[in-house]
């Protein structure tokens, strides 16, 4: 019997070379504000300051410079042109989280793990379809570390 993998959810990851040399600089350029927007859950973000206003954050150019080798690889993976529309940062205190959401129905989104200690889990993704045998929701937590970036279909709930 042959197995056919009819649908695949491609997630790409890359480790930023020499991340430890750049981490503090990136963090120093961030200006996060505490929010309890919609959920009452507290976390820190610059989403409403930059993304919602259509402004690029102070750290964007530096991050783009560091990610240039990653974008060169993406050019080889994707057979279509792409643009980077926006960038924002978020920080979660112990026990903090963000409500389940996606980033729209088209394209890819990314998470750069600027700071990730061993006590925090990376982003948890939820399958766009349920387990076929039991009907359960399936989840995936990528094996990433500080300085890694992952690219995922924007439609994926996380």
What is the predicted role of each segment?
Residues 83-155:
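Catalytic core of non-heme Fe(II) oxygenases with the double-stranded beta-helix
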Residues 1-80, 97:
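Non-heme Fe(II)/2-oxoglutarate
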């Amino acid at each position: 019997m042959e197995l056919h993998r009819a649908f695949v959810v491609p997630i790409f990851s890359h480790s930023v070379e020499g991340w430890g040399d750049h981490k503090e600089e990136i963090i120093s350029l961030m200006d996060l504000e505490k929010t309890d927007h919609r959920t009452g859950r507290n976390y820190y973000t610059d989403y409403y300051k930059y993304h919602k206003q259509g402004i690029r954050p102070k750290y964007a150019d530096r991050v783009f410079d560091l990610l240039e080798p990653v974008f060169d690889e993406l050019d080889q993976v994707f057979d279509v042109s792409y643009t980077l529309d926006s960038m924002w940062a978020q920080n979660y205190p112990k026990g903090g989280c963000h409500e389940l959401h996606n980033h729209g129905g088209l394209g890819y989104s990314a998470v750069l793990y600027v700071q990730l200690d061993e006590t925090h889990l990376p982003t948890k993704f939820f399958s766009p379809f349920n387990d076929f045998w039991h009907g359960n929701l399936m989840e995936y937590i990528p094996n990433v570390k500080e300085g890694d970036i992952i690219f995922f279909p924007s439609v994926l709930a996380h």
